[in-house]
Each structure stands twice: as C-alpha cells, then as structure tokens.
Amino acid sequence: MPRRQDLNSVLVIGSGPIVIGQAAEFDYSGTQALRVLKDEGLRVILVNSNPATIMTDPEFADATYVEPITPETVEKIIAKERPDAVLPTLGGQTALNTALALDANGALEKYGVELIGADVDAINLGEDREAFKGVVERCGAESARSVIVHSMDEALAAAEQLGYPMVVRPSFTMGGLGSGLAYNETDLHRIAGAGIQYSPTSEVLLEESILGWKEYELEMMRDAKDNVVVVCSIENVDPVGVHTGDSVTVAPALTLTDREYQRMRDIAIAVIREVGVDTGGCNIQFAVEPDTGRVVVIEMNPRVSRSSALASKATGFPIAKIATKLSLGYTLDEIPNDITRKTPASFEPTLDYVVVKVPRFAFEKFPAADPTLTTTMKSVGEAMAIGRNFTEALQKAMRSLEQKGSAFSFARPAVEPGPNTVARLVSKTEETTTERLRNVQRALLAGATVEQVFGATSIDPWFLDQIQLLNETADLIREDPDLHPETLREAKRHGFSDAQIGELVHLDESVVRGIRHALDIRPVYKTVDTCAAEFEAFTPYHYSSYDRETEVAPHEKPSVMILGSGPNRIGQGIEFDYSCVHASMVLREAGYETVMVNCNPETVSTDYDISTRLYFEPLTFEDVMEVVEAERRTGGLLGVFVQLGGQTPLKLAADLKAAGVPILGTSPEAIDLAEDRGEFARVLTEAGLRQPKNGTAHDFEEASRIAHEIGYPVLVRPSYVLGGRGMEIVYDEASLKTYLDNATEVSPSRPALIDKFLEDAIEIDVDALFDGRDCYVGGIMEHIEEAGIHSGDSACVLPPITLAPDVVTRVREATEAIARGVGVKGLINLQFALASDVLYVIEANPRASRTVPFVSKATGVQMAKAAALIGTGRTVAQLRAEGVLPADHDGTTLPEGTPTAVKEVVLPFARFRTPEGTVVDSLLGPEMRSTGEVMGVDKYFDTAFAKAQAAAGGPLPTSGSLFVSVANKDKRSAVIPVKMFADLGFEIVSTGGTAEVLRRNGIESTVVAKIADAEGEEPTVADLITDGRIDLIFNTPSGGQAARGDGYQIRAAATSVGVPTMTTVSELGAALQAITAQRQYSWDVTSLQEHEQTLRERAAQEASRD
C-alpha cells in the first residue's frame, strides 16, 4: 500500500520532561518519527515542553512548539496549524492521555483531525485495565484473577475476595506510578489510595499475587494488511514483583522453552489484533509460572514504549521509525531494512549475541527513601551492553553503571564462610534492592547452592548457574597469578575487566593490560545487523567481544571520537547527550568521520545513523582505549572529545592524554586547573575577581578551623562531582562533623571544599564559548530562587529580568577573563552570585553544561555545534562569518523584544517513599534532585513562568486558597506578596505565628493548627491539603537541617496530592506575577521558528540603526 496521499500535515505530541518511567527513549523515538515525516514531504508540527531534547531542535519540524503538553494548549496549536492528523504514539503516556482528552472534549472532531498510529478504541482497550482483561479473555488467554475498583471501600471488599498479598495497578499511568504490593490492609489503604489519585480515571486494578513468576515482554508491530512481526523478546532476570524498568533484563529471552515462546507469541498476535493496533507498535508483558508453565498476560502498552527503545538498540530494528511509516499507510513488506538494504521490515530480527540492560538508581539523592524495589519504577537511567554470551554482556553492563561497587567483586574472605554466614547471605538475596544481583553473586561465592538462592529469589536457575560460572572463572584466574594466555582469554570471554583480573591476582590494572597486549589478546568488534550475519550490514553499529574476526571496516580518513555520557542519572542526563549528538551531526556535515562511544540505550546518540560509526561500549578507560586502538588500526584517529558528555568522559581525559590520545577542545590540564582550588584562585586574582571565602580541608580539624575563620553557614562539597553530589549547607560544627564522617563515600581521594554560603544572593548561570582569543557568551541566566538551591534544581530566566546593564557587563567581562585564564577551547559554564551588588565567582566548568540546550533553544544559536567546530580548529570569528554564530550580537546583547524563556525543573519526589510509606521530603538544597526540565517561552516573563509551571505538571491556580507558613527570617519579605494574593481574592490560610504577623499588616487569614499542636478532631494543615482545600502553598524552611516536623509534613502532603508549593519568597513573587497575567488574558502559542524569525528581524533593525 502506498503512503496515504490525504495526509499533508501531522502534529506529533512529545512526551515532555524527563521523569522516572518516561525518559530519553521518547526523544530517540520522537526524533526518528520527525525525520521520517519530513522525508515523506509532510508538514511536521511538534509540541514538546522539553528543551533538552534533540526533537525540539527547529530543524526537525516545520513548526516546533515548546509549550505545555495539556489538552488546552494542544488544542490551541491544532486551531492555529490545522493539521490533518495527530500522531500520539511516540510521546509515552503523556501523549496518549492528551490525545484521549482531545477526543473526549471534542477538539479532534471540531477541527477534523484524526489520530494515526493508534485509534481511541485501541488506546482505551490497551490502557483501560478492565477493558484489556476482556480482550485477553476473548483471545482465549488468561489474566491474573483481578477486580477493578474506584474507591477504598471497593478495594477493601475486593481484598476479601482475592486475599493478600496482591498487586495494585492504576490505569493510564506510566512507570508503575501509584502501583505496589499490598501485604495487608494498611498497605492497601496507602497504595490503592495513591493509585486512585494518580489514575486520571480514578481506576485501579487489584490483582492476585503472581510474585516469583518469570516475567517477559514481546515487542510487536502490525500493519494495515495484518502483517505482524515480533521484533524482540525480552526476559526479566528479576521475577514478577519488580517493575520491568527496575529489573535487569536480557534479550533475546533465554530461559523459555520453545513451547512457552510459541504460546506467548500466539497470544500476543491475537491480542494486538483484538485491540486493533494496525498501524504501529506495541509492547505486551507476560508472566510464566515456573513450575507449571501457566502463562498470564500482565498488561499492554499500545504505543512505542521504554522497552521499544531497548528493543530497537538490541536488534537494530528502528521501531519508532517503522511505526511512523506504518501510521502513514505503508506496510511492513514495503519498508526496507536500513542495515541490510536487502530485507524488508517484515523480516523478524535474528540475534547472534546477547543484550543485557541494567538500571541505574539514585537513592543516594534520597537518603530517607525506602530502597526496596517494587512495581513502582524508581530507576533514573539504564546501561546496555552486548556480548557473545550472557556473562560477557552482564559484566560489561554492570561496569557501564559507573557507580562504586557496581561491578561484581570476586575477592574471597580470609576465613572460609561457615553455615551461619552462608545462611545470612542467602537471606539477604530475598531483599529486592539495588544490591540484589551482587548479593546473589556473594552468596554463591560463599558456598550457597543454586537451589538455595533460587528458593530465596525465584531468579531462574539458568541465570544463577551463569553467575556461579563467573565465580568459578574468578577462581581460575586467582589460581593462575602469572596470567597464562588460556586463563586471560577465558576471563575476557566472560567479560572480566582488567581491573577485576588485577584484583584477583594482586596486580595493577595497567600491568594486566600490559600482559594482555603483550600476548596480543584484544577484543574484536562485531556488528549488530538484524540478521545474524546472513546479509552484509551497511551501518557500522559495533560491540566488542573476545572473538576471532573483527568487522570494523577500513576508513579512508582519520576519525573524530565523541565520548557520550553513559546512563542517565540525576545531574547528568539527556542535556549532555544533546551536546554529543550536535557535535556528531555538525562534524559529519563538515566532512569528518565521527565515532560515538556510549552505552545508554535510551538516547539519540546511540541511534545507528547519527554518527559514522557507533560503538556500544562501557565508558571505562579500558573499553575506550580498545575502541581508540581499533580506530587507529583501521584508518587513524584525529582525536577525542571529552568535554561534551558531562563528568563521565572528563574523568577519562587525563589518562587518555597520558596514553597518547589527542584530546580535542579544552585540554585535561585546563580541566584540572578549573577544579584545583589554588590554581583557580590564582586565575581569579589575576583577573581582579572575587570568590566567597573558602578553604580546602583533608580532615575534620582542618575543616573546623576553616569554617570558624569563614563563619557559618558554610557550603561543603567534595571535588570533582556533578549534580551537587554530596553537597550540603552546614550551619554548625556538629553538622560539619556528621557531613565529613559520611563524605568518604563520595570521593575518597579528594579533599572537602568549604565555601562561605552567601544567603539571599542572586545566582547567575552563564554558558559561553572561547577559542583562545575571542569569547562568545551564549546566554546569561538569572535564577528565580536565591542561592542555596542547586542550579540544576532552580528555575531560571533568560534574558535576565532584574540584572542591571552594568551587572551584565561585569558578568561578560568576568566570563571572558576566566575562560582565557583557564585556557578553555570550546564550551565553559560559569556560576556567579550577586550579593549586595558584589559579583562573586562560584565555580567554572570547562565543558558542556546541562543548560546548553536551553540556551540554544532560547537564543536560536546551536552552542554545542559551535563548540565542536572550535575543538577542530575553527574560531569564533570564522563561525560568526559563516552564520553558525550571530554576526552582530551575543547572549549579553540580545535584540530588544527577544522572547523571555523560563526553565523549570521536574522533581521525582512522588516516586520515593520512606519505609513507613510517607513521601520523602521535597525540600530543595545544594544537592541536585531533579530528573528533567521544561521551558516556557513568551514575550513577557509572567506568562513564560506560568507556561513553565503548567508544563512541569504544577499549573498555578488563578483563585482559591493560599496556605502560608514561613520561617521568621522570611516574614517581613513575605508580607507584600501575600497581601497581593489577598487583594486578588485568594483566601489566606496560615498557622498561628505567621497569622499574627499577617494580621499586624492588615491581612486577615484563617488560622489552622500546626500538626504538632492539633487537638482532638481539629483539622491540621496536612488534612486541609489532603482534602483538596488548599490550592497553593508558600512554606519556607527554617535554617539548619530540615526537621521532620510541620514543614516536612506540609511538603509531603503537597507532593502526595500535587499542590504547587513555593519555598522561597522570590518564587512566590514570580507565581504572583504569573497568576495575575493568567487572570487577565489567555496565553498564545508561538513556534520556535516564529521566535527565531522575530530575533532575526529585531537584530537586523538594530544593526540598520547602528
């Protein structure tokens, strides 16, 4: 069937900010979709609120709307653009729910727009728990016994029928949000209550426990001719009970019998047909009872999902790309395979390798959170590895996590473990925590049997045998300290790193590497080709293995290598992948062969056609150096970029240079200079710049002396970290001692850095480019919150709205002086604080920052592309002349009338609960906790801020009640904004002390009891919030460590029910402006292309006046 000719324009709904359960994989999927639609000659319209995505680059769509993904806003875009169709299946749950709302409110019918990729009936059948249960029954398959409920009374009645434990699954949520395992009535009240609230239809499925069953997924595609393919089978190593996003997974499924697989396949094909997905992909999850082989269907996603990205990277089959073509009317047999160029998409991929995905968690950011893994997803990222066998892939994936202790350790204890020790270790394997797989390996190493560990974990014995095989291989290595060739080859075939081998034979990693190279034991690089080498592969997508024959083809000119950022984590996310992708794209355009090294299956950078060659490898020195050597052997290497992927590649810079690898852009020496307190202070002194008083301490006595000299409060942090890891504001000596006692986990070989904390300062962020001579300031961002909240968690605005022109000039001059003094060649990010009109330098990061995408979108200048070209020898002057950078202005001299852009963050507190079941404290501080960001852009700040809040999931109310409870230090500054809220007609609710201050200033408020002071049936503020009687909260914390008192319980209640909460006076002021604007007029929607046109016109007008 040819492409539908009645479609001329398509609106794609993106997934919005990166959140747990819906992350970078939707940028990968969406970018593929946009490229397909453009190639087909369609007018492409995109709505996505996330500026850190590649898909929101203006070049990928004809009209790119960085606007809130709400039904109201998307309807405005439809009314303006009048698309023929909406494609909602590539933006995760956000896009699906928005599409359903547009159908329900009549907007699609009103404007004559159809859904493509999946229709409303198919979405409802796949997502509605009760409807899907009927689908499964009609297909002759089984679901787990279950009951649908819409209230707690119904849930309690269902519990008597199903019995405990049972699984709670809300409808229409993502990443298992609101789901869990209820072992008793208390659990049921807590989990089902949250689930009913999180489900947009207030619907929850209560399901019989199938804990301990084996869990599988099938990635399916179906076209309009009823051709169905199974793209990939995925098996969870963890049994049912741990969300698939938090489980170690493997592709293809390894422990299914052929009979079980065929049964599962038959069910999946019947289900996709019955649901009616006929122009796209879907994901179906199964559970198999290990003793009887009974198969039940768990759930279905009638859209491209998180697993689709993994399956695409695992197989080389671009699911999102093909799903988009199917939505346009093509059939699978009409779509060519990009990799082989000979087979159609109707050929199911065949794998001659094993893929393992391991999740990455961030519990260190939420120390109060319960680390138990359940059906609610908690991981913030993932790493993937490919090997010729399971053990090789598993070990490569584990070391790709880059976390201390993430790889297996095979050191045996000095004393042989006794029965009690073994029993204790086996007992630990029952705990479903992030340590589970390592606990399994330790128990087996100590002498536990596979049967014992299987009894404790329900992990399939085949996987346990493989882990036991690793322990046995470790013993072989231990018994051969001379490292004979057979031993080394065997170790490498099972994925042992040089560091692991060195640990076993008491040799340094470099010595092991020297022995290995002397024996010519090196990896070869195989190709992901979708067909198990049956046809030639035309896309060089490689993975390492200690096999015989390499498949890296010779190349004619030296390559440029870009090191990616590895698995997403808090502090290092999609923003860094953005810079890597831009560098690869612009360098290819400039005629270079580019090589990407990364291990993150979610990202655009690991798409097989972004770079000339892709190596899916861990970002360790050993693995990167082997790729370097492979490139050198087949055509040469110009150099390596380490400044684009965040802290991960930066940590490798010095070792790579020492090994003779040319580093492109900023040198390792300059990187170290910026981190070295003494050297950096010298640069600032020479430039006449000031820092907050500071010192460097190696022990508590030194730290105590420095803190007393500087004066409390002080900001304490380790060196060489990203995302404020381990950073804390300390108010007294006891807190300082507690911090240092715990800080060794953060960066053991580095001293603690101590700074005077500047209270009430305005924080300023700058992204700039320097070529050794000229500086281009990309943007100056003013933080909306005062200093003290990590820049990655703070809302900011560009251009700045309260900085005087002379401050902007001082910032610009300081930026250039620091870039020159440090010796930057490429990007630099600087943070300043303005206190009492004195400009202080907080820190300099000579690399791509997380704000580069935001600055690029806000100003229309591709900063990462410019940085890559500077790294290969171009100058700022040349880039201005070529139009890569503006010829007549930079981020400090933006034309008058430049739109205002606000960046707001998205926080994951609703995902994390304490062991008692309460939400963790949402109080922000100097350690970063946000997972993603959104952008609001408009002519004026007030509307841009309102858009950003709506996009982040916390739309501001225009009426209702405002609860106010502020610390003593904030009471004076809070009076005026609270008075203005009262004047707008908001009911003011406050606690006793705050109420008295407000009353003395002529502001009447309803007094509510503090939680600790409530008597009898008297409602507390937490009760009012939970009951929906509070619409906005203003709660500033007292100094010192936040007590688990009223403040915490107020914030926890607000997080649970999603009430917008302001914790600083400046944030309340911004909210006041936004609410006032919203009450006066409805905002317009404007595409980035229109904003850029306005910028060009304004710049031209100003240039002509000059």
UniProtKB/Swiss-Prot annotation:
Q: Which residues bind Mn(2+) 3?
A: Q831, E843
| Residues binding ATP 1 | R129, R169, G175, G176, E208, I210, E215, G241, V242, H243, Q285, E299
| Keywords assigned | Amino-acid biosynthesis, Arginine biosynthesis, ATP-binding, Ligase, Magnesium, Manganese, Metal-binding, Nucleotide-binding, Pyrimidine biosynthesis, Repeat
| Pathway linked to the protein | Amino-acid biosynthesis; L-arginine biosynthesis; carbamoyl phosphate from bicarbonate: step 1/1; Pyrimidine metabolism; UMP biosynthesis via de novo pathway; (S)-dihydroorotate from bicarbonate: step 1/3
GO molecular function (one)? ATP binding
Q: What is this protein called?
A: Carbamoyl phosphate synthase large chain
Provenance organism:
Kocuria rhizophila (strain ATCC 9341 / DSM 348 / NBRC 103217 / DC2201)
Record-listed Mn(2+) 1 binding positions: Q285, E299
What residue stretches are annotated with the ATP-grasp domain? 133-328, 681-872
Question: Which residues are listed for Mg(2+) 3 binding in this entry?
Answer: Q831, E843
Ligand binding (Mn(2+) 4): E843, N845
Q: Name one GO biological process term.
A: L-arginine biosynthetic process
Amino acids binding Mg(2+) 1: Q285, E299
Enzyme nomenclature, EC number: 6.3.4.16, 6.3.5.5
This chain is encoded by the gene named carB
| Assigned protein family | Belongs to the CarB family.
From the UniProt entry, list the residue stretches annotated as the region Carbamoyl phosphate synthetic domain.
551-953
Instruction: List each copy of the MGS-like domain by range.
Output: 954-1106
Question: What are the boundaries of the region Carboxyphosphate synthetic domain?
Answer: 1-402
